[in-house]
């Protein structure tokens, strides 16, 4: 089967957070992402933290005065970020044990796989999916 895509894979996803301590604690200490690089950008008065996510990266920008994300009605652009896990049930238990609230586990209508959502400190929806 011929590969028609001009892209190899996703290199990174960029997330904007508003609070350095809360966002770093959430993504590094609670979710377990490894810091690859961390830089304070004086000219912008913000931080950029690059996190390892498998072979991809998450760029976590901390911008104090960034406008709040519009959730309802849904706006154009990125809707949520989904992470593949071996077991949604096991991952939910780990998240809940760390104080992270998750929605009830449900089956994806189209794949039949288990999935659920939770939110980061700035209310970005995050999904786990088998």
Report residues per predicted region.
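Mid-chain, well-packed structural core segment of small domains
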Residues: 74-89
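Vicinal oxygen chelate
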Residues: 1-6, 92-130
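Short amphipathic alpha-helices within nucleic acid-binding modules
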Residues: 26, 89-94
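N-terminal beta-strand motif that seeds the catalytic metal site of vicinal oxygen chelate
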Residues: 1-22, 78-81
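A short, acidic/glycine-rich surface segment
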Residues: 36-38, 44-46, 60, 65-71, ...
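Core segments of cupin and vicinal oxygen chelate
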Residues: 16-57
